Amino acid sequence: MTLTLAVYGKGGIGKSTTSCNISTALAKRGKKVLQIGCDPKHDSTFTLTGFLIPTIIDTLQEKDFHYEDIWPEDVIYKGYAGVDCVEAGGPPAGAGCGGYVVGETVKLLKELNAFDEYDVILFDVLGDVVCGGFAAPLNYADYCLIVTDNGFDALFAANRIAASVREKARTHPLRLAGLIGNRTSKRDLIDKYIEAVPMPVLEILPLIEDIRVSRVKGKTLFEMTESDPSLDYVCNYYLNIADQLLAMPEGVVPNDAPDRELFTLLSDFYLNPQTPVKSQEEELDLMMV
């Protein structure tokens, strides 16, 4: 049985870097993995392959849009740790519908029977869920993962994505596996959000410069660790996420917070910060100093 994952989150939050490292972690656990980039920028799999692979749209144009002339090897490229990679691509800037391209990519891969060849398929999807086309991967996913940080905007976007998961779960066996906190030294705002909208937190990745550098180098953290073993501890974050997913967690159908309520909840966190209450011992220590 194929495990299908869909990774969403605010634009620029680090979804692609996170996705590539999760895909690699799953491959390190012995799984055959396909990662599908669903973004017109077509850079989802750059960290796995080290270059911008041709997109399905590029290939269709070369074949004059004759779908029957396309073979799996025309659109699937081998990445690090044996992870297979596909990029949907998109229409020219300012023209056409990127969401439609995502839907067509899924359709083509199903016609090629590509979905049957893998233990895990991971969709890395553009930013927020802005239309039905970009929500299409949720129709095929077992779990949605939301990448966020400890900030207002990313959690506001996460809430909208949670609403899409809830809507799709009405007609599909879809669950939210949980949040992944990325590039954050704190999690207090994340904790405040999940108090209002209960959902699991799979992992919190601290602000580690090497994660950003890996993106620029076009390498996963696992590949960088081969020449710098001190980075092994970073890989353990992604292996932990992979192990949780392979255990087939129960997940949740989230109840998103209404926009205005969430706006008030999150903004209040900044405008009215809670001052931690000091214990008597702490007060005495302060007086002695």
UniProtKB/Swiss-Prot annotation:
It comes from the Bacteria. Binds 1 [4Fe-4S] cluster per dimer. Mg(2+) binds at S16. Its EC number is 1.3.7.7. Pathway: Porphyrin-containing compound metabolism; chlorophyll biosynthesis (light-independent). It is an enzyme of class 1 (oxidoreductase). One of its GO terms (biological process) is photosynthesis, dark reaction. InterPro entries: NifH/chlL_CS, NifH/frxC, P-loop_NTPase, Protochlorophyllide_ATP-bd. It catalyses: chlorophyllide a + oxidized 2[4Fe-4S]-[ferredoxin] + 2 ADP + 2 phosphate = protochlorophyllide a + reduced 2[4Fe-4S]-[ferredoxin] + 2 ATP + 2 H2O. Keywords: 4Fe-4S, ATP-binding, Chlorophyll biosynthesis, Iron, Iron-sulfur, Magnesium, Metal-binding, Nucleotide-binding, Oxidoreductase, Photosynthesis. One of its GO terms (molecular function) is metal ion binding. The keyword Lyase does not apply. Its cofactor is [4Fe-4S] cluster. Disulfide bonds: none annotated. CDD domains: Bchl-like. Belongs to the NifH/BchL/ChlL family. Component of the dark-operative protochlorophyllide reductase (DPOR) that uses Mg-ATP and reduced ferredoxin to reduce ring D of protochlorophyllide (Pchlide) to form chlorophyllide a (Chlide). This reaction is light-independent. The L component serves as a unique electron donor to the NB-component of the complex, and binds Mg-ATP. This is Light-independent protochlorophyllide reductase iron-sulfur ATP-binding protein. The gene is chlL.
